[in-house]
Amino acid sequence: GTFTAKVDRNNFSGMQGTVVARVTNSGVGQAIAISGGTEQSENLQIILTSFDGEGSYDLNFVNIGTYSFLPDPSNPDPNTVVVYSTVGTGQGNNGTLNISSYDGNTIKGTFNFTGYNLNNTSESVSVTDGQFNIEVTNQ
């Protein structure tokens, strides 16, 4: 599948093997996680907790968009990972995910969001021009 975006105007392209769309059945319906990673140890992920097929979803503290990276890829200590998220201060919506097609096998759409540093919400990144077209994994 393909998974691309711009993070603060820098190109982000998910490597083969890291691009995943996983649908899971939760007690209240379906959830989906869409993600991709780069050779520079960057990761973009969007999680919808109540996924209902095609349509537009707000990204916030319930449906979450994240951008994360390892500051020093030669030191893969998970404690050093820097995470930017749409959770922000827990107020309002900080982005949108649009699913243009979903047939149970393939999912396609676009996204954009502002991610706020989990350790310092005054720092943010802008994720724009997000696009994906991915084969779905069901769990």
What do the predicted segments below correspond to?
Residues 6, 37, 116-118:
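A generic structural motif
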Residues 95-139:
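C-terminal or internal capping secondary-structure element at the end of a domain, subdomain, or sheet
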Residues 3, 10-15, 19-104:
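Surface-exposed helix/loop patches within compact recognition domains
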